[in-house]
Amino acid sequence: MSKQTQTTRKTVKDIAAAKGATPLVMLTAYDAPTAAILDPHCDILLVGDSLGMVVHGLPSTVGVTMEMMILHGQAVMRGASQAMVVVDMPFGSYETNADQAFLNAVRIMKETGCQAIKIESGAYAAGQIAHLVERGIPVMGHIGLRPQAINVDGGFRAKGRTEDERDRVIAEARAAADAGAFCIVIEGVAEDLAAAITAEVSCPTIGIGASAACDGQVLVTQDMLGLFDWTPKFVRRYADLREVVDKAAAEYAADVRARRFPGTAETYSLRKQGS
């Protein structure tokens, strides 16, 4: 009988235990090499539908498909062995009813091997969350600014700035938590609202543009690394890889055109007979 060894990954219980403790670290990952680099530093790797904009150049996340999420989820699972891997359910894959949500969530988990899925959880999605959790699928909620809803909201803008919006965001948080979400992403809200939600719900909250009042933080990795020429207000750049890549590409192009590359060190030579 053969032995199988398995690296211990972060679990739902590990994430739940972080409530009010050391903040959770989450970053996005869309490919195996990046996942391997981020894996030792993160509690959670999110295969976000942001990949539509970040990797595929789409104008929003609305055009992202199940096939895209599964392909990138598989790649991240090959690169990561310690962090929990969560895959976004794309727009149109869960809204119709709980059965649709279950079938698509099962497909994502079976075909990628991920540990959980994420749903942009307006209050209407509470039924879907409960349905999935009852059937063994861990769900991360997502409230506040919901990128999949930009066509209703009129673009990417912060939420909870009016009393009505504030009440709606709090209701979304309560609904997701009561339905069994093991964690909730709070995006694009003011600090006092993020603090109020974090204090009210029993599950951990992870903020993106929602202040340090949350139980953890997430950023799009490419934003954090400075790969784009525009930086959102809530992002802190920890590198300027756009400049690094631009400089490297320029030097490579110059060397090729001047026939400095490849040089002797990068060129194969015929072996002498007997050597």
Swiss-Prot record:
The record's catalysed reaction(s) read: 3-methyl-2-oxobutanoate + (6R)-5,10-methylene-5,6,7,8-tetrahydrofolate + H2O = 2-dehydropantoate + (6S)-5,6,7,8-tetrahydrofolate
* Annotated positions binding 3-methyl-2-oxobutanoate: D49, S50, D88, K118
By what name is this protein known? 3-methyl-2-oxobutanoate hydroxymethyltransferase
* Gene3D superfamilies given in the database record: Phosphoenolpyruvate-binding domains
The task this protein performs is described as: Catalyzes the reversible reaction in which hydroxymethyl group from 5,10-methylenetetrahydrofolate is transferred onto alpha-ketoisovalerate to form ketopantoate.
**What gene is this protein a product of?**
panB
Gene Ontology cellular component terms for the protein in this record: cytoplasm
Q: Which pathway, metabolic or otherwise, does it act in?
A: Cofactor biosynthesis; (R)-pantothenate biosynthesis; (R)-pantoate from 3-methyl-2-oxobutanoate: step 1/2
State how it assembles.
Homodecamer; pentamer of dimers.
Q: Which residues are catalytic?
A: E187 (proton acceptor)
Supply the enzyme class, top level: transferase
What cofactors does this protein use?
A: Mg(2+)
Recorded family membership: Belongs to the PanB family.
The GO molecular function terms of this record are:
3-methyl-2-oxobutanoate hydroxymethyltransferase activity; magnesium ion binding
- Which BP terms from GO are recorded? pantothenate biosynthetic process
The compartments listed are: Cytoplasm
Respond yes or no to whether keyword Membrane is given for this record.
Answer: no
UniProt keyword annotations, A-Z:
Cytoplasm, Magnesium, Metal-binding, Pantothenate biosynthesis, Transferase
UniProt cofactor note:
Binds 1 Mg(2+) ion per subunit.
The yes or no answer to whether the keyword Magnesium is present is yes
This enzyme's EC code(s): 2.1.2.11
